């Protein structure tokens, strides 16, 4: 990072998490892992499971937030209400509560599949140029399934189901917190699959302080797709196309 003043490791984690308000758990985990690698500290399996559960819970909540946004764009009031309500219920839920919410989450997917007007508005919208490269996350995974806004919707729904399954087999979700690293020095890096795709962080640690870092986010790669997606499109379709990328303004490099 440019214009970055050396900061204590714990404060750096808070800085990174608060700088990314749409995916704070993902970026907290990213910072913890990079610092722990720099310090030569390894997590125990229970901590890893708890962190993974928290990451998947954030993925579910994030995708529900995206679905609510789709509802707002298209004027589907029921979708805005249902997805927003579920998002709030998921955000801080423990494992047993998430299991309880599974039928409601699956029912939402079923209803979306039975909404012909939704398919009509999303199918063929936001098709990526064939030369698109370095795609990440749901945008990349949907590229082989039609690569349009409709495919991205179904990719995110599939990820909600997959995340639920992972949580059922993992530990109780816990916010990542830094292991005791002492005042060590070293370099570390980490990669986390955030709700919007892979984020990578490399950093330099000196006497327990982060001296410098470099952060690479999925959205910083996807922002370049916008111009092609809106070219020659009516405003409504252009907004849906861009919305289907789920860009976070905080995660787009200046």
Predicted features by range, described:
Residues 1-254:
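Active-site bordering "gate/hinge" segments
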């Amino acid at each position: 990072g440019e214009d970055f003043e050396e900061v204590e490791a714990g404060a750096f984690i808070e800085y990174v998490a608060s700088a990314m308000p749409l995916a704070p758990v993902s970026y907290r985990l990213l910072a913890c892992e990079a610092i722990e690698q720099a310090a030569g500290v390894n997590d125990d399996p229970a901590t890893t499971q708890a962190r993974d559960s928290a990451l998947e819970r954030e993925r579910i909540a994030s995708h529900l937030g995206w679905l609510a946004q789709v509802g707002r764009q298209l004027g589907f009031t029921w979708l805005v209400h249902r997805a927003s309500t579920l998002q709030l219920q998921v955000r801080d839920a423990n494992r047993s509560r998430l299991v309880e919410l599974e039928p409601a989450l699956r029912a939402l997917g079923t209803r979306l599949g039975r909404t012909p007007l939704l398919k009509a508005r999303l199918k063929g919208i936001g098709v990526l140029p064939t030369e698109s490269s370095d795609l990440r996350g749901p945008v990349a995974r949907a590229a082989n399934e039609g690569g349009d806004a409709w495919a991205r919707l179904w990719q995110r729904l599939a990820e909600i189901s997959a995340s639920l399954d992972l949580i059922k087999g993992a530990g109780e979700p816990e916010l990542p917190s830094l292991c005791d690293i002492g005042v060590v020095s070293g370099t570390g890096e980490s990669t986390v699959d955030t709700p919007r795709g892979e984020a990578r962080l490399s950093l330099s640690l000196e006497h327990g302080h982060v001296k410098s870092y470099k952060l690479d986010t999925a959205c910083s790669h996807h922002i370049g797709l916008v111009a092609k997606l809106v070219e020659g499109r009516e405003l409504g379709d252009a907004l849906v196309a861009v919305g289907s990328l789920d860009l976070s303004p905080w995660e787009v490099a200046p």
